[in-house]
Amino acid sequence: MKIEEYTEKLREAHFGELVGEILFREMAILFPDKAQDFQTLSIVEQLVGNALGELLERYQVRPVENARVIELTRHLLADIQPDDWNGWLHQFREVLKPFVQEFDDLYIHGPSSDLVQLRLLRDHERMLLYYVDLEIAGHDGLSVIQSFLESFNYRGEK
């Protein structure tokens, strides 16, 4: 993979994490029964976004402008029906699947110097998919998110 292609993929992934951080924070309001899940997911997105931000700095790549982050987040929020939890889960699952594969590929083909951050990116996306699968099956997925954070010795406020 050429460096230009690699850094563009990093930039896009970072953009997604910024959107996810805000989106999940707002979804805690839309789905009050799942507020803790979404607040914790927002922390995960922030953690991953910060790790990718470090890579963007290393490669001297400018992140996507905040206005685009806010614009996409608002657009995504407008499409969410707060009374359709299961519908949202199924839609989100379909959105996640290609990213799981993309981040697996990025981890496999990325520079060895970036493997810590790329593993975090890959593993968090897999965790999100597992969370969604548990919720679709009628199980509580919060423990999966919490275990993920604990595996990185996260000590922030929850």
Per-region residue spans from a language model:
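Non-heme di-metal
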Residues: 1-158
